[in-house]
Amino acid sequence: MQNGRALACTPRKFAGKLQVMDVAVILPGGRGWGPVLKLAEIAAEHLGGRLIKIPAESLPAGRLGKLATLLPPPRPRGEQKLLVIASIGDHLNAVLRSGVRRHYSYVAGWVIDSFWEARIPRVARSRGWYDHLYVTDQQDLDMWAAAVPCPVGVLPWGADVAGAQASWADKQVELQRVGRQPQVWDDDDAVAGAAANAGVSFAGRPPFGDTDEANQAFVETAYRQAKAVLAFGTRTARAKYNHPTKDYVTARWTDSLAYGCLVAGQVPDTPTAREILPSFALVQLSDTDVAQGLEQLKAALTQYDEEKFTAIRTWAREHLDWRSRLDQIAADAAVN
């Protein structure tokens, strides 16, 4: 546990006593996980604990991980509590690292990509390793609840709304591309040409940074300047790393709303998406015809003004901020 670092912060108070939780996040390597790392940093600060960064390659896996779960978990010796933020189910194996489970009286796990049924790990299915688990979409709840012995809750993807610095004066780009897109929207040069012909200002994908933190900073600058962010669900914007049939909300939608942007494209068709994404901030675009989509966007932009920008930010603050999710985790830990 020596790779954790102390953060100066105020613990949350529940049930008449301070609740402090350490936060472990697994670093999978590669780009694209910046939002998860940022969530972990916010969580450690908000919950008053240490932030512990664990390289994915150090997790027990295969035969070693299986053998570890054949024995009952060690009896905890302390009263400390731990939240494991797992980008994928396999990252829950963090509690199998030597000494981890003995150190904590209560361990919760929050699985971000919770849609993979085949990737619910043995450690989650085994009694005593986790006290509470959370998934990010209601559509995943039943399969996890049927597979694991501990309580399972739904905590949707959110955003650092409190930290999102944006003003109406910043909004100079009418359409900002972020992330994967359907084939007809994927060529930034072609879309830029079509947008110019339609009288729409367009910015292609943000540059990639040398680190996750730098990459995240580029993306946040793009959100800050955008009136609308281009985003399509996995049904129309396939990639080999996506689930082949399930749709789901990612950071593009929630971060866009945190910065007061419209989200233009096609919304994931899930119960949680319908709950947390406000219809007044969504613009349906064609996934097969860029010219048609740009006309749909232009119509929506005529209704996008400072009042709507403020309304979107207000919605995000009330429904999407990570800290409200973390308060639920702390409250559940206090009950236990």
Where does each model-flagged region fall?
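C-terminal helix of von Willebrand factor
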Residues: 144-145, 293-297
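Short, conserved loop/helix-junction motifs that constitute active-site signature segments
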Residues: 99-104, 124-128
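Active-site proximal beta-strand in glycosyltransferases
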Residues: 100-114
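Conserved acidic donor-binding segment of nucleotide-sugar-dependent glycosyltransferases
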Residues: 250, 281-289, 300-302
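Nucleotide-sugar donor-binding catalytic core of glycosyltransferases
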Residues: 4, 11-73, 78, 86-95, ...
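Short catalytic-loop micro-motif centered on adjacent basic/acidic residues
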Residues: 83-85, 109-110, 176-178, 313
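A charged, aromatic-enriched C-terminal amphipathic alpha-helix characteristic of glycosyltransferases
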Residues: 288, 299-333
